[in-house]
UniProtKB/Swiss-Prot annotation:
Record-listed E.C. numbers: 7.1.2.2
Chain sites annotated for binding ATP: G153, G154, A155, G156, V157, G158, K159, T160
Keyword Nucleotide-binding: yes
GO cellular component, one term: proton-transporting ATP synthase complex
Protein name: ATP synthase subunit beta
Species whose genome carries this gene: Chloroflexus aggregans (strain MD-66 / DSM 9485)
Amino acid sequence: MPAKGVIQEIIGVVIRAKFPEDQVPEIYNAIEIPLEQGGRLVCEVQQQLGNGVVKAVAMGSTDGLRRGLEVIDTGRPIAVPVGPATLGRVFNVLGDPIDGGPPFGPEVERRPIHRDPPSFEEQSTQAQIFETGIKVIDLIAPFTRGGKTAIFGGAGVGKTVVIQELIANIAKEQSGFSVFAGVGERSREGNDLIHEMREARIDENTTVFDKTIMVFGQMNEPPGARLRVGLTALTMAEYFRDQGRDILLFIDNIFRFVQAGSEVSSLLGRMPSQVGYQPTLGTEMGELQERITSTKRGSITSMQAVYVPADDYTDPAPATVFSHLDATISLERSIAERAIFPAVDPLASTSRILDPNIVGEEHYRVAQEVKRVLQRYKDLKDIIAILGMEELSDEDKLTVQRARKIELFFSQPFTVAQQFTGRPGKYVPVKKTVESFARLLNGEGDHIPESFFYMQGDFDDVLAAYEASQK
């Protein structure tokens, strides 16, 4: 018989309920409140206050609640459906479908969203490059298969577009399964993404959406839902990993997860720490990130968008994410302002596997030479601004010309942005990327004006565009 209690107090989304002292719900248990207008409100127990009293955070709106209503302990944490039936569906934090499709019956397995990370013995640490088809990422900051990568950037520099392109590329080129967690972002963007994925076809019978699970806890949701929606998506991804699959987990935006934790922490009356963040910031981030890992059976490769408040990378939220990552992609406003998309800063982006033993000697050499040319150009910018290009040596003039071409060549037309730009998207394999930049560094493009390098795929596309203009 499930334990029953009554609501004592409601403050915003925090509910205080009293249960019999010998039947107090455990921490993280889901408790349900049957609503008078029909339906139920699920809350998660966060604190036990003694004398049978618990504090819980609501996963939905508390409109219409009042003191004295009955509360039922479910006896376990929030549990969400997992398995092949979840592919091509859209869920909320509780694992309820929100796409208008049929609900899931008892035949579908459900797993609790709170679980321990895999043990040390189970974890796998092989270093292998994961091809994305985006030139600047594959060359300068290659993703690790089964690793964690974050895309950092301020407001409006293109984080979500890069993530959308990655989902489309991976579904088409590698036919992998993806799980997308929309954490505290705009509902409109989520809606756009669903429609784009339904239209993007892998073959005649399959769309990108059919191979993707989507979980949303958007800006309009209470902080409890935004805090837990990442765990819901991760639980669904873990199922496929444990079945021996290689799965992709996209989280947009991990900063909103921190923000929701801060709101919940304040509502529960905890003392804030630096810059007003929750004192448990590191612990909460660790609980999520440590579960995103690869085992000997399968892998989870994760890509996370990280909003950087006021473009300040020393803010505790982005700084906490840094320590968990294998690769960092930094999007820069100054590059976006020049209409170079993706607006990746190659000198600020890093990857643990940019190592000749992993990516190969040629890839490593080309990447380092590209960085050297760009860094030299950056150093010369002050001299150019004061004295002009004429005062540079011939060698430096050539370096500047090549650096400008490299910057423009890092731009790339995206499939998901085709409706805005009118340019068909280009997927460039790693091999082609390395070869293209090697040819540029060797001087094969020195006679081509820099404008021909803008928004092209590989080096052959640049040559074709230039030759077409000469006819």
